[in-house]
């Protein structure tokens, strides 16, 4: 299975992080490697892919904390594995609690505070981005764990690039002056950049932010894309976990 390992966390022995793709030799189906039970894929195969992915990142499948994402801007502090409703971001300072994000175009963001030892995982689509969910996650890490943003290492993962993020006027209005006029009469938003700006405004250092250049819509061999493939699109997972 092809797994993306963020460079920003490489060399740090007590944190593990990764993101799945749709490539792997287990996938002899059209959908490719998929980690969601809710898109019509064979549950046995999804389970096998699920275990393989987390094993490859070095995380136990019993340690997962999974937000049941709803395009909110709610950030939840968790101390145990499990499923969590009504939220799109989790933070923890507990080892062996692996924070999971589920995506297919939306932006997965992973945060690590190596000084006060805390992590965060955020799902930011355009609604979450407008709702400043990344800003709220950093604020909650500051409040709960005394995190200094200057120390945070951040990963902004593969997601819809500005190249493919054309929006209608109703979304553009909500983004205000943040829209990117790309072609005449078309309006584009740049979610990776918006979330990067939220981190910078919170005091995270530019050198401490790794931004994936991959576009999930353009790179169809490697990534699932809801916008490209619709309801039956597979899903990818990103995860971060502190170890002993
Ligand atoms: Zn693209």
Regions found by a protein language model. Give the residues of each.
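Active-site microenvironment for binding and transforming phosphate-containing groups
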Residues: 1-244
